């Protein structure tokens, strides 16, 4: 495989990136420094139930359970101030999230802070997957194990 560093290569890379963003089954969401949604892919629509038109420009509170918001925004501000997460690079975070219909789901995600051309923090991108079924299976297994110990 060769790499064309010219315009054709840039166009091909742009087309490839757009295809990945639009066809990923995982939610890919980008938000600005204030936590307003800048990008919302079809995977995010599938997982959370909001289409892009509903999500763009909205606060991430859209998908964050109310009692977790203060903690979320504390971490978000830390990343925006420092450019680094308290979690290691590539670590999966597991948290509850909200769907449009109000149901809680469990998601795993990674975050990627992004900067502008001047090196200033501009926002955060996240790749998320719904792990609700796996979380519920683990909870059921723990209950069964606890019941057998009694």
Kindly label every feature range from the protein language model:
Residues 44-55, 117:
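PAS/PAS-like sensory domain cap-loop motif
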Residues 10-35, 39, 43-45, 89, ...:
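Sensory modules in modular signal-transduction proteins
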Residues 120-130:
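PAS-family sensory domains
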Residues 9-11, 15, 135-150:
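Sensory-domain boundary/capping and coupling elements
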Residues 52, 61-107, 115-117, 121:
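PAS/LOV-family and closely related PAS-like sensory domains
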